[in-house]
Curated annotation (Swiss-Prot):
InterPro entries in UniProt: Helicase_SF3_DNA-vir, P-loop_NTPase, Viral_Helicase-Primase_Cplx
Biological process annotations from GO: DNA replication
Signal peptide: none
Superkingdom of the organism of origin: Viruses
Residues annotated as domain SF3 helicase: 477-642
Origin species: Sputnik virophage
SUPFAM superfamilies: P-loop containing nucleoside triphosphate hydrolases
PROSITE patterns: SF3_HELICASE_1
GO terms for MF: ATP binding; hydrolase activity
Enzyme class: hydrolase
Keyword terms of this UniProt record: ATP-binding, DNA replication, Hydrolase, Nucleotide-binding
EC number, UniProt record: 3.6.4.-
Protein name: Putative helicase V13
Chain positions recorded as ATP binding sites: G504, K505, S506, N507, A508, G509, K510, S511
Length: 779
């Protein structure tokens, strides 16, 4: 090697072996909250950031809705005094190193703080006695600690903590100065005699220990960092004894399957305890004494976190997809997410309804964006590099699976399908039919599938009058029963067990009323083909398939049917099924499984004419209510042709398709239901029911048709053979569905015909045939 060459010889520092390595359990949730606190000083922020970086695993704690983080911590002896004294957490990144309030806040009840009470004075006293070193004042302080502390507090008018710190300072040969809370101290004008003698004795004890512990003193003597050598040897000896006790405590707790989380100099943090803590600590004290012949006094020390700054409820950070999901539920509410039968439903608080859309999830993430930062890395200055679950497309998709796992409830649809009955959802809130009150905002516990396409309208009597005149007032002479029926249906009063037949001629206003209802109440109003409730003996579909229409409309409130063929009868069993006060029905979509559901709707059949009902028993009759549309709306030139004609409003479309009409029309029905609650159902016009029931219609048909083709004379000389009348009945399309017995009954009771018999034939007397000149084609 030439002289000009520069060489650098680096002494290899021996790798330090930790005294012990533990896994520290902390509240990861509270740690993240601290990192998000504005009042945190920069030094502590860096310390906590680097500490957070060490978390290698997290688990949830459902008992207190916390998240437990785990950190591996290595403990070493001091660099200044290797292999002796206390052990310190590597780089100070442990609960051991944090201030009491910070430590308690991060601990959050996960660990118990077990403390060796009055550790150093107690251990030094025992050491002195074992080595024949007189220590009467130290022994007196250990035996009568509370009394001596009280004396110091009263004499100097200071707090208990100040008194303890003063005595420990004197124990380690410090000056007689009273400590202040800010770290400064002052010399009192008067001193307590006991403390003066206590200080003198401590100096003697330190001198004796230095002579006895020669090897230890030699290390300290040669260490330039140790200024007061005698004080240091006293302290280090106490720390050695303390550490020995600490290790035996560790051995005891681990033998009991109790986890030691953190070493804290004169104690430790432990968790996983079952049983009585007091009994456990007494047993541990005995174990330590048996092992090293030193007595200790253990106590559970309360951990209080009176922080001097405000900590936010939610932190700015999440550390996993699962953590993101948990925080989303905390911010938004778990009840806003339901994974039911393979479908994720998310409550949209902008509409008041559950939606099958991940975009609602993403919208919630964006709303609370500041809380979903994911730390990718942290530099040595504690600065974080982050991504955000609200803006990162890859991250936000990852939480969907965790949401599904945590909110699965395959009974949710079934349990909530009638939860909205008695309520009506508007664009800005919920109307309660039972209290006649509107509340702004939405409730995920009331599951709506539809909503009114309007904000809840203000109550305006003039608008109500105008809407009434344009709708019900124009359609009916006495609309109150019909309005009440619609109001009850809209409120979900399925317990009334009614189906409404609403017959009327063409252009009677039935279609317009349906349009008005749909315009004002949106999807709460459903429509069906009248054939859906007709009887079809050739229909081979299973029942669930037949009721597909009902399943699709299950959450509507009012179902309006269109015209129905008179060639088919109405299914009486279906009437009973759909007016059953909430009995469940089985339905399904095409190629899907059967689902049990409760129809929330009431059916209104808007027919021109009403077919026969089969079967038509008393249960069917009790469920049927009849409301007739009595008028026909025509042009002006046709107005006088019929007594039931009314002038058609050519501008009706533009008049009802307005916000003002909707405001008034909505309150017509809301008021009607309020009146129903106060006064019950109004009386219905029984004449309408009688007019449109099957028996009355049969009478009308038979009498009108017979009178058209025959003349009723009630003259016994006039007669028509029975077989001719029977043939006539069977050939006429409107008579052949009526039974022979019923037909004959009407001839006798209504037309007053009498059956006669001669030697050659049987006949109806009082009747003669009209002559049209040609054969009649009954079809």
């Amino acid at each position: 090697m030439s002289k000009t060459q520069k060489t650098t010889v680096k002494a290899k520092k021996a790798k330090r072996i930790p005294v012990i390595e533990l896994v520290e359990a902390i509240s990861s949730k509270n740690l993240k909250r601290l990192l998000s606190a504005e009042g945190l000083d920069e030094v502590t922020r860096i310390q906590l950031s680097l500490y957070y970086r060490k978390i290698f695993k997290t688990t949830s704690n459902p008992l207190n809705n916390d998240e437990v983080g785990f950190i591996k911590v290595k403990y070493f002896h001091s660099d200044k005094l290797e292999d002796t004294g206390r052990v310190y957490a590597e780089k100070g990144r442990s609960l051991q190193s944090f201030k009491k309030a910070i430590r308690a806040f991060i601990n959050n009840g996960i660990n118990l703080d077990i403390d060796m009470k009055n550790s150093h004075p107690t251990l030094i006293t025992q050491y002195c006695k074992k080595n024949k070193i007189l220590c009467p004042f130290l022994d007196d302080y250990v035996r009568r600690r509370e009394k001596r502390l009280e004396d110091v507090m009263v004499f100097h008018k200071i707090s208990r903590d100040q008194a303890k710190e003063l005595i420990l300072r004197l124990c380690y040969l410090g000056s007689y100065k009273i400590p202040n809370d800010d770290g400064t101290s002052y010399k009192p004008k008067k001193t307590l005699e006991f403390l003066e003698k206590f200080k003198e004795e401590a100096e003697i004890i330190a001198d004796r220990i230095a002579k006895k512990e020669k090897e230890l003193y030699a290390k300290i003597k040669d260490n330039d960092d140790c200024k007061n050598k005698k004080a240091v040897i006293l302290s280090v000896l106490a720390q050695q004894l303390e550490h020995s006790c600490l290790m035996e405590m560790y051995n005891f707790f681990t033998s009991k399957k109790i986890r030691v989380s953190t070493l804290c100099f004169d104690g430790m943090l432990i968790n996983g305890i079952n049983g009585n803590i007091s009994d456990l600590l007494r047993e541990c004290e005995n174990f330590v004494y048996e092992q090293i012949n030193y007595k200790i006094n253990l106590e559970e020390k309360p951990m209080e976190h009176k922080l001097k700054f405000e900590v936010p409820i939610f932190s700015d950070y999440v550390d996993s997809d699962s953590d993101c999901q948990i925080k989303l539920f905390e911010l938004v509410g778990k009840n806003k997410f339901k994974f039911c039968n393979g479908v994720l439903w998310v409550f949209d608080d902008q509409t008041g309804m559950f939606e099958n859309s991940n975009h609602v999830v993403f919208r919630y993430l964006k709303r609370y964006k500041e809380y979903f930062n994911f730390i990718i890395s942290t530099d040595d200055d504690g600065n974080h590099k982050t991504k955000n679950y609200a803006t990162d497309e890859v991250l936000r998709k990852k939480i969907i699976g965790f949401i599904k796992d945590e909110c699965q409830d395959n009974e949710w649809m079934l349990k909530t399908q009638t939860s909205s009955l008695g309520y009506l959802l508007f664009k800005d809130g919920i109307y309660n039919f039972n209290t006649s009150t509107f509340t702004e905002g939405f409730d995920p516990n009331i599951v709506f599938k539809f909503r009114v396409p309007w904000k809840f309208p203000k109550y305006d009597k003039e608008l109500i009058k105008k809407a009434y005149k344009l709708s019900f007032g124009a359609l009916f002479d006495n609309p109150k029963p019909f309005i009440t029926s619609l109001a009850c249906a809209l409120a979900g009063e399925i317990k009334l067990k009614k189906i409404y037949f609403c017959p009327g001629k063409s252009n009677a206003g039935k279609s317009y009323l349906i349009k008005m209802l749909q315009y004002c109440f949106g999807d709460y109003i459903g429509t069906i083909n009248g054939e859906n409730i007709s009887y079809n003996s050739k229909d081979s579909r299973d029942e669930a398939a037949k009721y597909r229409w009902a399943y699709l409309l299950a959450n509507t409130r009012i179902v309006m049917s269109s015209e129905i063929s008179m060639k088919k009868s109405i299914d009486g069993n279906m009437i009973k099924k759909f007016a059953s006060a909430g009995d469940k029905i089985v339905g399904r979509k095409h190629c899907e499984s059967e689902i049990s559901f409760t129809p929330n709707f009431t059916i209104f059949c808007m027919f021109n004419d009403i077919p026969e009902i089969e079967p038509h028993d008393e249960a069917v009759s009790n469920r049927l209510v009849y409301h007739e549309f009595p008028y026909v709306f025509v042009k002006e030139e046709e107005l006088n042709e019929k007594p039931y004609n009314k002038l058609k409003d050519e501008d009706l479309d533009s008049k009802y398709q307005t916000k003002d009409f909707a405001s008034g029309f909505i309150h017509i029905l809301l008021d009607a239901y309020k009146n129903y609650l106060e006064n019950g159902l109004p009386e219905f016009d029984n004449e309408v029911k009688e007019k449109w029931t099957a028996q009355t219609k049969q009478i009308d048909k038979v009498t009108s048709i017979i009178n058209e083709y025959y003349e009723v004379t009630n003259n016994v000389k006039d007669f028509v053979p029975l077989n001719e009348i029977l043939k006539f009945k069977e050939q006429h399309k409107d008579l052949k569905t009526i039974s022979k017995n019923r037909f004959n009954e009407i001839l006798v009771e209504e037309l007053k015909l009498k059956e006669g018999r001669s030697a050659k034939l049987r006949y109806w007397s009082g009747l003669k045939k009209r002559h049209f000149g040609d054969d009649i084609n009954f079809e």
